[in-house]
């Protein structure tokens, strides 16, 4: 309700979040005012471990997964249907063909890609053109102050093709709020304290904590919170169209919304560039193993 009252009209979920529970909750929350919301969900990640054919981007699974999402969301159409992750084991034209059928059937209005490399975005665009399928309208990359790798190829590709960019994890799973101190235990109840697997593999680094503390001190000196600073940095990039915010509390939500009015200066930009080199992560090895690089090994044959 707070989001709606603030004018937010774009809501993002996925079939794999909490085994489908996120879609059910989202559907219930917006059902009374479905037409005022731009509803996005995703396909590609596994919904349940140990079961066959419940993930990936095969034609069979994409069609089944879409029907499952529609049922959980309680709607007859999905406004934006993301390919949640690349699936090198499935021919791209098979996936795109399935998406085209969903669009023609009226079950999906538009589609997008998430966690795709720049060269794969180009392949998606070419495949859509060849197969006569509407091209993707948005890309959802993992992009924030601590991970600037999308600036190398992903964002330029989106800019070139006119694809919107909806960045996720804008505060790096909480690290950019400044809540984690170098050499100190993680705050009780935080992701760090829970030893969140994905966070332990990427953001949970002493170097990242130190950078976050420097940015927090600078932000507060200029009348902003660390969260407002992190979001203002994203908004200052003209290629970024939208930001996926995931606050857990109303207080965190207010911090996000006030970031819309936060100013950005050349001094801010210079400080960020001095701490995290453009196009690079904050520290060597900072990459999500869930989405590996393929430069030293072949992708699966298609």
Identify the role of each PLM range.
Residues 43-45, 117, 143-147, 169-176, ...:
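Glycine-rich beta-alpha junction loops
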Residues 3, 11, 26, 39, ...:
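Conserved, mostly hydrophobic/aromatic
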Residues 5, 48-153, 160-164:
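Glycine/proline-rich, positively charged
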Residues 184-217, 221, 236-241, 250, ...:
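Terminal-tail/helix-coil boundary detector
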Residues 36-48, 140-141:
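A short, structured active-site edge motif that brings together acidic residues
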Residues 150-190, 225:
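Aromatic-lined glycan-binding groove of carbohydrate-active enzymes
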Residues 1-41:
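N-terminal binding-site loop/beta-alpha segment at the start of enzyme catalytic domains
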Residues 1, 23, 27, 66-70, ...:
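Generic structural signal for well-ordered alpha-helices
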């Amino acid at each position: 309700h707070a989001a709606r009252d603030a004018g937010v009209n774009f809501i993002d979920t996925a079939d794999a979040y909490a085994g489908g529970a996120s879609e059910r909750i989202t559907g219930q929350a917006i059902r009374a005012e479905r037409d005022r919301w731009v509803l996005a969900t995703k396909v590609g990640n596994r919904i349940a471990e140990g079961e066959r054919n419940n993930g990936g981007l095969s034609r069979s699974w994409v069609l089944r997964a879409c029907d499952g999402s529609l049922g959980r969301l309680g709607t007859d159409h999905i406004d934006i249907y993301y390919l949640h992750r690349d699936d090198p084991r499935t021919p791209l034209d098979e996936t795109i063909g399935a998406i085209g059928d969903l669009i023609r059937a009226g079950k999906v209005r538009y589609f997008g890609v998430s966690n795709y490399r720049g060269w794969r975005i180009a392949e998606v665009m070419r495949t859509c053109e060849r197969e006569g399928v509407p091209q993707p309208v948005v890309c959802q990359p993992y992009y924030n102050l601590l991970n600037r790798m999308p600036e190398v190829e992903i964002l330029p590709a989106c800019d070139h093709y006119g694809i919107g960019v909806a960045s996720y994890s804008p505060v790096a799973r909480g690290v950019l709020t400044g809540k984690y101190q170098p050499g100190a235990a993680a705050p009780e109840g935080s992701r760090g304290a829970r030893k969140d697997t994905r966070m332990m593999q990427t953001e949970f680094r002493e170097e990242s904590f130190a950078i976050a503390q420097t940015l927090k001190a600078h932000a507060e000196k200029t009348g902003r919170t660390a969260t407002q600073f992190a979001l203002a940095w994203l908004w200052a990039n003209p290629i970024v169209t939208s930001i996926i915010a995931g606050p857990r509390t109303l207080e965190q939500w207010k911090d996000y919304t006030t970031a819309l009015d936060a100013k950005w200066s050349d001094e801010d930009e210079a400080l960020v560039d001095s701490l995290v080199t453009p196009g690079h992560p904050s520290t060597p090895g900072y990459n999500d193993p869930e989405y590996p690089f393929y430069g030293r090994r072949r992708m699966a044959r298609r």
